[in-house]
């Protein structure tokens, strides 16, 4: 079982979310990672244990998409970030605040535009980073709304969710116990 520790940071270098994943495999969309029920997500001042399985897709784009199992507030959650750097069992990227989100009803929106506006000034995002982040956000928003793969519901993600269950198992009772975190 190959594990990858995800270590996100803010542009100023301060730590953001960290969590452990397992490598599921690769396809035309990129490298698929998974985190099972009970995975600990931590950042300064906050932590929770994941209530449902989640997939993470590593590409060379300015984003880190995640795909949630049913029963969560988000079906798709895409962090706009610098292109992820995966080396030696660790993935590093700078979170650039913007998130493209699709809820279980299909409603899709951009979250944290206010944070992006504030942090681009406070943390001094270079113009090329601002341009790349806003372009990635627009591109991903269009793809999620259009249902383009890999944002096509379970068509692309179902085999990877099955692979995750094979590798780390899945437990409805563990999911119910973790539900108290609300994630």
Feature annotation, model-predicted:
Residues 135-183:
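Cysteine/selenocysteine-centered motifs that mediate thiol-based redox chemistry or coordinate metal-sulfur cofactors
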Residues 30-31, 63, 76, 108:
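Hydrophobic residues embedded in beta-strands of well-ordered beta-sheets
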């Amino acid at each position: 079982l190959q594990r990858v520790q995800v270590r996100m940071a803010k542009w100023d270098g301060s730590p953001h979310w960290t969590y452990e994943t397992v490598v599921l495999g690769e396809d035309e969309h990129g490298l698929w990672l998974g985190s099972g029920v009970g995975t600990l997500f931590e950042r300064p001042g906050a932590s929770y244990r994941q209530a449902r399985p989640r997939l993470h897709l590593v590409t060379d784009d300015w984003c880190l998409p995640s795909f949630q199992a049913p029963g969560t507030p988000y079906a798709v959650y895409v962090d706009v970030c610098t292109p992820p750097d995966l080396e030696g069992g660790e993935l590093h990227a700078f979170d650039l605040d913007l998130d493209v989100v699709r809820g279980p009803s299909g409603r899709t929106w951009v979250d944290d535009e206010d944070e992006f506006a504030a942090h681009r000034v406070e943390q001094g995002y270079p113009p090329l980073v601002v341009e790349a982040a806003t372009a990635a956000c627009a591109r991903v928003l269009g793809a999620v709304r259009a249902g383009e793969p890999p944002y096509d519901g379970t068509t692309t993600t179902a085999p990877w969710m099955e692979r995750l269950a094979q590798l780390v198992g899945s437990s409805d009772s563990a999911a119910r116990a973790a539900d108290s975190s609300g994630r």
